[in-house]
Amino acid sequence: MSSANTTVVTTTVRNATPSLALDAGTIERFLAHSHRRRYPTRTDVFRPGDPAGTLYYVISGSVSIIAEEDDDRELVLGYFGSGEFVGEMGLFIESDTREVILRTRTQCELAEISYERLQQLFQTSLSPDAPKILYAIGVQLSKRLLDTTRKASRLAFLDVTDRIVRTLHDLSKEPEAMSHPQGTQLRVSRQELARLVGCSREMAGRVLKKLQADGLLHARGKTVVLYGTR
């Protein structure tokens, strides 16, 4: 895992997506053939160069997909939560090794199954479920592409203040966000917010101070109350 001094820039934030197109029975049958494993917070499940032969399904917790540059900078490609598949590209594009990092953001339980084993099951016991599973993966891939395009446009065309405002609204839709009488309460540090929008921690702090002065939010420590977002 990268050191605390690593520069991180984030291009996309994802909401947890509860089992797209998958009913409880399909999930149960899929999990019956998968290996369940628990991971602590901030654990690298795989890194660039590791063998690419496994599909992951997030049972609980949250993970991030990260691209690592040669100068040790990291580009966070997405946050994914329970009900989402990760590492699905290997089902469609042949690749011997991973090109990104899969890192847990919280304590996680993941279901793991090899591509080869899953393809076999699609021809046998999971044959009735194969269309639904593949459709769910396809929907997730499409949503991730749209989200990445939207976030890339923000980085290209919006200033830091606008990026922070939109990112805070994104975070208000995350499962970790809490209802507040005046809106939505978020727990996010200046450093984390800076990584989410691609600016310095100092700049993030100045923008939060300005937004508070403008009456859009209240920020204290790692707590931000975003007004009017219930």
Curated annotation (Swiss-Prot):
Residues 158-230 form the HTH crp-type domain. Allosterically inhibited by cyclic di-GMP (c-di-GMP), which binds to Clp and abolishes its ability to bind its target gene promoter. Residues 190-209 bind DNA. It holds the Pfam family cNMP_binding. Keywords: Activator, Allosteric enzyme, c-di-GMP, Cytoplasm, DNA-binding, Repressor, Transcription, Transcription regulation, Virulence. InterPro entries: cNMP-bd_dom, cNMP-bd_dom_sf, Env_Response_Regulators, HTH_CRP, RmlC-like_jellyroll, Tscrpt_reg_HTH_Crp-type_CS, WH-like_DNA-bd_sf, WH_DNA-bd_sf. This is CRP-like protein Clp.
